[in-house]
């Protein structure tokens, strides 16, 4: 398996919305490397989870400004990917969540 694939996919995003989308529309959500494009994300998901990817949508999320005492700081910017997989296929990693 390609080591680059594991650098592209940072972590799965498990929220109430992502769980609903997974169950109803076969969509998986990941936090990905900010430099990754849709083609690289598609190849990484197909290699790691052995599924057929139909579509990839990406979103750049700006970090929120937070206050720490009297100072303001900013959380890191990140990139999210919404991956649609072929109907009938499942990813064992997300089952039971």
UniProtKB/Swiss-Prot annotation:
Q: Which is a GO BP term held by this UniProt record? A: translation
What superkingdom does the record give?
Bacteria
Q: Which cysteines are joined by disulfide bonds?
A: none
GO CC, sorted alphabetically, is:
ribonucleoprotein complex; ribosome
Q: For this UniProt entry, which residues form the secretion signal?
A: none
Gene3D superfamilies attached to this UniProt entry: 3.30.70.330
Q: Which GO terms describe its molecular function?
A: rRNA binding; structural constituent of ribosome
Which keywords fit this entry according to its UniProt record? Ribonucleoprotein, Ribosomal protein, RNA-binding, rRNA-binding
Primary role:
One of the early assembly proteins it binds 23S rRNA. One of the proteins that surrounds the polypeptide exit tunnel on the outside of the ribosome. Forms the main docking site for trigger factor binding to the ribosome.
Instruction: Give the family, as the similarity comment puts it.
Output: Belongs to the universal ribosomal protein uL23 family.
- HAMAP family given for it? Ribosomal_uL23_B
Quaternary structure and interacting proteins, as annotated: Part of the 50S ribosomal subunit. Contacts protein L29, and trigger factor when it is bound to the ribosome.
Write the protein's name: Large ribosomal subunit protein uL23
Question: Species name for this entry?
Answer: Syntrophobacter fumaroxidans (strain DSM 10017 / MPOB)
Q: What lineage is this protein's organism placed in?
A: Bacteria, Pseudomonadati, Thermodesulfobacteriota, Syntrophobacteria, Syntrophobacterales
